[in-house]
C-alpha cells in the first residue's frame, strides 16, 4: 500500500498535471475565453473575447492577475470628498437627514454600477464585489454613507493582495466597526457582534469556536471604534480598551499591548479551518456551487503555503482542472449585478443614468450596500424562481430598449432631453420650445406599452427605460435662456417623465423647473412627471457642477425621476466599443471566418454552447424553473451574400436578443 501511494503521488499525479498543462498551453477558443471572462469580470464583450482567443489560459489568467496591480478607481461623488459629519448627531433620525443620507447612498450606488460597466480593470471590481459580500457592511440601519465608499476602495486596492493584511485593515475600517456595532464595544460594556461574525462569517466558519472565544475576541476588539466628531475616522481609544491577557482558540495574547488586532489575526489565520473556509467561498463564487472538498483542501494549502498571499492562490484557482472542467461551465447562476452589468459590458451599453439600473437590481434582489443581512446575499439557485425569471427577462428587454437608442449622444451645442414614457395604444408626444419658440416635436421610441407589459407579467414594478431626444445646434438660437417641455398627447393613459435637460454640457433636473401653467390639473404631481397636457419650464443659467451634486442631495425624492443622481456626469469613455455588429464581426475575424457560423459563434459567446447543439446537452441548473419559460432561438439568418448590410445587422440583433431570453443566459 505504501508503494502504491508513493507511485500514485510521484508518477500518476504529475503526469495528469502535465497532461492538463499541455492542453491549456494552446490558445483558447471562444468558449474558453467567454468562460474566463464571465467568472473574473462581468459579461464578455466581443472585443474582450477577441483579445483572449490569441492567449493561452496561463497568459490570460496572468493578464487579469497583473491588472490587480493598478485597479482603476472611480471619481467619487463630491460629497465623499467633503469633511465627514457626525452621522449620529442630534437630529440624525429626522426625515430630512434620513433622505439626505439615502440620496448619498443613491449617488454611491450609481457611481459604483457605472464604474463596473466602464472599468478597464474588471477583475479588481469583481474581487471588490466578492469582498463586499464577504465582509458585509450595510447602509441600514445606521445610514452611514461616505465610509462605505472608502470600504469598497479598500477592497479594490487590497482585494488581490494578502488576506492577512486585508483582514487587519477590515478590523480597523470605520464602516465595519460601525456596521457591526464595535463602536459601542468597550472594556466595561462589551459588544460581541463583530467578534462573533469575525469568526463565523469572515474566517473560521460555524462550529470552530465557542462562546468563550467570542468573549475573548470581543475583549481584543474593545476600544476600536471611530471618532464621531472627527470625520468618522478610525480611532483606538486606549481608555476603552481591555489590555489584559486573552486566550483565543487556546492561544495567548499577552497583556499590556495597546493594539492586539495583529496577534488576533495571526491566531485566526493559523487555524487550518480559515484557509479552508476562504478557499471554499472562492470555489463557490468562481468555480461551482457543488462542494469539492478535495479541490478546496488543495487550494487551502496554496493559501497557507504562501502566507495568505492571494495572487498565487487566485492563479491556482483559475488554472485548476476544476475551473476549466466542462462540467463546471455554465454551473454558476448570474447574480442580478452579473446579469445587468454583464449585459451592459457585453453589448457596449453605457447609459448616462445609472439609477434606473439600480432600481432594476433592487427588484431582482441585489443592490450595493443593501445586503439583506451580515451574511450577505444568498447565491446560486436562490436567485432563480418563476417570478425572478420573468423579471430577469423583462429587465433584459429594458436593456435592449436602451441599446436600441444608445447612439443618441448629443454633440457640442446640441440640446438634449432625457425622458421616458408609458402609454396604452397611443405613443407619447411632446414639444420642445426654446426662448418661447418651438424647435421640435418628439415622439417616444421605446416607451412602455402598459397593456403589452401587463400581458407579459409586468404589473408596473419596473420603470421604463430612459431615452434621449436631441435637437441639433443648427435648429437652436445662439443663446438659450429658457427651455419648455410640453406634453401634448390627448390620451389620458399617456405619461411622460423628464429626467433632465442638457444645455452646453450641463444638466438641468426637474427640481430646477416649474410647471406652466401652475394651475394645470396635474401640476400637483412631482416636477418632471406629466400626467396631463402641461408644460415644464427650465431657466438656463450656468452653475457649478460639483456643487450641484451636493445641492441635489437635498432634492425631493421620487420613484421615477433621478433627482439626486441625474447630474453625476462621468467622463465619456474615449475609444468606446464599436457598434455591436462591427464588434461581432471583429470577433469572428479573429476566430477565423469560415471556421464557425455566426449563429454558433453567437451561441458560444452568449450561452457558452453552439446554438445548433441539442438544448439538453447540459441539464439546466434548475430545470423545473428554467424550462417553462424557454424561448426558441431564432436561426433564420441568411448567408451574408444574400442580404444587405442593414438586413444582416438586424438579423444579428434579432438572433442575439432571442438568445438573451434563453434561460441558459442566466448561467455563467
Put a short name on every predicted segment:
Residues 28-46, 271, 275-306, 314-410, ...:
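Flexible, low-complexity segments enriched for small/polar residues
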Residues 92, 105-112, 144-349, 355-359, ...:
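Active-site substrate-binding loop specific to GH73 endo-beta-N-acetylglucosaminidase modules
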Residues 410-413, 425-426, 431, 440-441, ...:
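Activation corresponds to long, low-complexity, non-globular regions
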Residues 485-492:
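Short beta-strand-plus-loop segments that form exposed binding edges in beta-rich domains
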Residues 46-158:
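N-terminal accessory alpha/beta regions
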Residues 440-476, 517-525:
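Extracellular carbohydrate recognition and processing domains
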Residues 10-22:
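Bacterial N-terminal signal peptides
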Amino acid at each position: 500500500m505504501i508503494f502504491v501511494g508513493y507511485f500514485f503521488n510521484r508518477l500518476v499525479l504529475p503526469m495528469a498535471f502535465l497532461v492538463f498543462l499541455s492542453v491549456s498551453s494552446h490558445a483558447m477558443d471562444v468558449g474558453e475565453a467567454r468562460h474566463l471572462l464571465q467568472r473574473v469580470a462581468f459579461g464578455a464583450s466581443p472585443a474582450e473575447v477577441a483579445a483572449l482567443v490569441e492567449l493561452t489560459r496561463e497568459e490570460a489568467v496572468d493578464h487579469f492577475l497583473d491588472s490587480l496591480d493598478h485597479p482603476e478607481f472611480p471619481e467619487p461623488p463630491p460629497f465623499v470628498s467633503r469633511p465627514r459629519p457626525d452621522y449620529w448627531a442630534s437630529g440624525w433620525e429626522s426625515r430630512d437627514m434620513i433622505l439626505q443620507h439615502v440620496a448619498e447612498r443613491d449617488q454611491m450606488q450609481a457611481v459604483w454600477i457605472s464604474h463596473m460597466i466602464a472599468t478597464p480593470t474588471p477583475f479588481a471590481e469583481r474581487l471588490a464585489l466578492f469582498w463586499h459580500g464577504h465582509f458585509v457592511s450595510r447602509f441600514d440601519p445606521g445610514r452611514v454613507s461616505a465610509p462605505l465608499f472608502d470600504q469598497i476602495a479598500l477592497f479594490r486596492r487590497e482585494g488581490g493582495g494578502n488576506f492577512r493584511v486585508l483582514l487587519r485593515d477590515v478590523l480597523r475600517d470605520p464602516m465595519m466597526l460601525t456596521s457591526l456595532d464595535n463602536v459601542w464595544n468597550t472594556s466595561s460594556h462589551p459588544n460581541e457582534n463583530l467578534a462573533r461574525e469575525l469568526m463565523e462569517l469572515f474566517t473560521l466558519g460555524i462550529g470552530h469556536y465557542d462562546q468563550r472565544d467570542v468573549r475573548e475576541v470581543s475583549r481584543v476588539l474593545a476600544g476600536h471604534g471611530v471618532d464621531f466628531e472627527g470625520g468618522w475616522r478610525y480611532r483606538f481609544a486606549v481608555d476603552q480598551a481591555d489590555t489584559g491577557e486573552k486566550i483565543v482558540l487556546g492561544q495567548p495574547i499577552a497583556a499590556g499591548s495597546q493594539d492586539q488586532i495583529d496577534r488576533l489575526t495571526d491566531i485566526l489565520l493559523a487555524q487550518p479551518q480559515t484557509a479552508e473556509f476562504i478557499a471554499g467561498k472562492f470555489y463557490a463564487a468562481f468555480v461551482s456551487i457543488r462542494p469539492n472538498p478535495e479541490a478546496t483542501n488543495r487550494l487551502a494549502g496554496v493559501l497557507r503555503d504562501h502566507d495568505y498571499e492571494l495572487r498565487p492562490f487566485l492563479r491556482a484557482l483559475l488554472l485548476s482542472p476544476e475551473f476549466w472542467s466542462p462540467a463546471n461551465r455554465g454551473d454558476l447562476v448570474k447574480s442580478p449585478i452579473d446579469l445587468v452589468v454583464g449585459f451592459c459590458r457585453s453589448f457596449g451599453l453605457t447609459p448616462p443614468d445609472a439609477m434606473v439600473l439600480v432600481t432594476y437590481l433592487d427588484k431582482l434582489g441585489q443592490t450595493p450596500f443593501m445586503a439583506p443581512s451580515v451574511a450577505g446575499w444568498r447565491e446560486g439557485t436562490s436567485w432563480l424562481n418563476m417570478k425572478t425569471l420573468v423579471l430577469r427577462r423583462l429587465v433584459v428587454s429594458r436593456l435592449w430598449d436602451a441599446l436600441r437608442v444608445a447612439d443618441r449622444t448629443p454633440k457640442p451645442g446640441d440640446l438634449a432631453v432625457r425622458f421616458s414614457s408609458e402609454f396604452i395604444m397611443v405613443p407619447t408626444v411632446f414639444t420642445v420650445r426654446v426662448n418661447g419658440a418651438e424647435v421640435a416635436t418628439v415622439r417616444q421610441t421605446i416607451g412602455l406599452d402598459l397593456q403589452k407589459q401587463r400581458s407579459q407579467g409586468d404589473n408596473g414594478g419596473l420603470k421604463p427605460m430612459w431615452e434621449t431626444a436631441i435637437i441639433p445646434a443648427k435648429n437652436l438660437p445662439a443663446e438659450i435662456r429658457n427651455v419648455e417641455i410640453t406634453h401634448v398627447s390627448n390620451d389620458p393613459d399617456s405619461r411622460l417623465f423628464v429626467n433632465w435637460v442638457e444645455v452646453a454640457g450641463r444638466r438641468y433636473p426637474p427640481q430646477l423647473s416649474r410647471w406652466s401653467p401652475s394651475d394645470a390639473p396635474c401640476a400637483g404631481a412631482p416636477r418632471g412627471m406629466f400626467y396631463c397636457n402641461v408644460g415644464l419650464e427650465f431657466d438656463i443659467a450656468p452653475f457649478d457642477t460639483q456643487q450641484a451634486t451636493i445641492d441635489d442631495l437635498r432634492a425631493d425624492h421620487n420613484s421615477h425621476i433621478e433627482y439626486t443622481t441625474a447630474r453625476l456626469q462621468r467622463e465619456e469613455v474615449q475609444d468606446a466599443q464599436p457598434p455591436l455588429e462591427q464588434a461581432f464581426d471583429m470577433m469572428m475575424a479573429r476566430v477565423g471566418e469560415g471556421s464557425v457560423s455566426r449563429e454558433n459563434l453567437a451561441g458560444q459567446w452568449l450561452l457558452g454552447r453552439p446554438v445548433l447543439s441539442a438544448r439538453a446537452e447540459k441539464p439546466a441548473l434548475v430545470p423545473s424553473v428554467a424550462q417553462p419559460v424557454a424561448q426558441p432561438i431564432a436561426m433564420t439568418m441568411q448567408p451574408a451574400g444574400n442580404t444587405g448590410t442593414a438586413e444582416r445587422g438586424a438579423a444579428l440583433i434579432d438572433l442575439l436578443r432571442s438568445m438573451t431570453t434563453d434561460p441558459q443566459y442566466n448561467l455563467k
